[in-house]
Amino acid sequence: MILPAFSKTYAGVKALDFPGTSLKPARIYAILGANGSGKSTFAKIVAGVLSADRNVCISGSIGYLPQKPYAFRRSVEQNILLSGGTQEDAERLMEALCLTDLRQKRADRLSGGETARMVLARLLMKRYDAVILDEPTAAMDMESTAAAESLILEYTQQTGCVLILVTHSLQQARRIANEAFFFRKGTLLEAGAAETVLYHPAKLETKQFLQFYGDTTQS
């Protein structure tokens, strides 16, 4: 997948300046950076839900899970099946994300973590050329996060999609990402193999970020 160069300006201030790159299939790209660094703006533009300063053309089908996804006032099972796919797919995803016992519960009565699991299952019902997940496990507990990460890995490998994962969790990036992009003040400061960016970054700003938000040594 080819991402062209693009930028985004708000009230005369450039919030994002992306140089463009190519993304490899069957790879997970962790998008890292502090709050306000441009991560979500990048994700929204690639997903096509936010316009850049100039038109951006990205080929292929794209699935997008925003930070605050919409849940229909229907049952968990009905929400998941709205994406299409088979009942068998829905059963498998509900079981993997511990939603089977909640299948008849209305979505507007779910907790934050339950909703996060449901909307992830709904997205993964379909096959896309690229999937963009913006903080998909932020509301989940450790057990649910582990199940979600396992599904994300499985989906990426089985479909061969490009998966873009916006995350504040360095631990999550270390567990499942193949590649990492580090944004700072709207600029892509560093990009490369996750192992390199997360443990042996070239830029001082990346090192400082890793030291502040988490230990850079392997455990």
Where are these regions (language model features)?
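The feature captures the beta-strand-to-loop junction immediately N-terminal to the Walker
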Residues: L32-A34
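Conserved ABC ATPase "signature" region
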Residues: E88-L102
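Catalytic Walker B motif of ABC-type/P-loop ATPase nucleotide-binding domains
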Residues: V131-D134
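H-loop/switch region of ABC-family ATPase nucleotide-binding domains
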Residues: T167-H168
